[in-house]
Amino acid sequence: VEMETGTGKTYTYIKTMFELNKRYGWSKFIVVVPSVAIREGVYKSFQITQDHFAEEYNKKIRFFIYNSAQLTEIDRFASDSAINVMIINSQAFNATGKDARRIYMKLDEFRSRRPIDILAKTNPILIIDEPQSVEGEKTKLRLKEFHPLFTLRYSATHRKDSIYNMIYRLDAMEAYNKKLVKKIEVKGISVSGSTA
């Protein structure tokens, strides 16, 4: 999904979660973000849109930020039948060697289980926010360890070599025409693929 900056990418993928739950019953989602700052912004978006979506869908999403010191959240994520979202920044699962992350370790305080195994058993839907900042080769391999049902990638600027199955594209002109942005400035025009 390609959406112009400032047009509601986070809102759109939260609504997508509700729709996927409503239509197919899917309830496990992991939002992968490139940085702590974006992670905090995404968390805030979940907070401020919670009542709005509860009104529309008559249910709430249970969301949390992955924290290797609060592993009970992962158990709750796996066992709860409601819509559950874990927000995680790529650094939390993307180190190896002596810096190996706790998500891959058998932990005494987690009944000698590995957090990644519990998450993978849920076959979550991965939502990657700004994939061009997240999807290096090592990260792509690590993402597979979540055993996702499928992956949705949301960005304003997908890299040309990493566009897979584009299902929606909201470019600057369309965003302006839909009154999603106040003003655009055009230096030159070149139209590339549209899903309209």
Task: Outline where the language-model segments fall.
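RecA-like P-loop NTPase motor core of helicase/translocase proteins
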Residues: 1-196
